[in-house]
């Protein structure tokens, strides 16, 4: 039983990045934009997260370094996604082609940058300050479920919370309704005054 619990816990922990990416893809798809550049966003986000955390650690931020790395991943993923958004929404580029270009650009540019920044090394140095698993008191003691869900990294808990938040925003708020309307019926949404391109 412990083996299964550990296996499921590991699956949950390592799927955290995929959950973040999937939520971003969900918003994009719901707004009517095909986004196959998610892999590129993940690659660029992972790279800039590691670089930001490395320099933050070198600057003496200590335990805050991984959190700053997480913010760095978010910011640079926003930059890459903005390229995709401008190309598809403003200039009407083919969404599949744009996403493919983002994937290629992210893979190539990050590989080049890591070699340039770290003197020819193909990877970033190992960080001292990293996220550690957090045990939630009492809940961790629940048989099986406690080991699976309540023994994870802070980012895993954030990802699970965001699933609930995104669901509520999409299906329980006017903003979510507008977002879904521009994806499903953009002409009808425009007729009632929703700014389709701005929403996307």
Q: Can you describe what each PLM-predicted range is?
A:
Residues 1-21, 34, 48, 57-68:
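Membrane-interfacial amphipathic/re-entrant helices at transmembrane-helix boundaries
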Residues 7-11, 40, 44, 67-75, ...:
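Hydrophobic alpha-helical transmembrane segments
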Residues 21-22, 46-50, 107-111, 156-169:
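Hydrophobic core segments of alpha-helical transmembrane domains in multi-pass membrane transport
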Residues 26-48, 89-102, 178:
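Short, non-helical or kinked segments that cap or interrupt transmembrane helices
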Residues 26-27, 51, 55, 79-82, ...:
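Membrane-interface helix caps of multi-pass small-molecule transporters
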Residues 61-107:
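Alpha-helical transmembrane segments within multi-pass membrane transporters and channels
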Residues 107-145:
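Extracellular/periplasmic helix-loop junction at the C-terminal end of a transmembrane helix
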Residues 148-200:
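Helix-loop-helix "hairpin" substructures at the membrane interface of multi-pass membrane proteins
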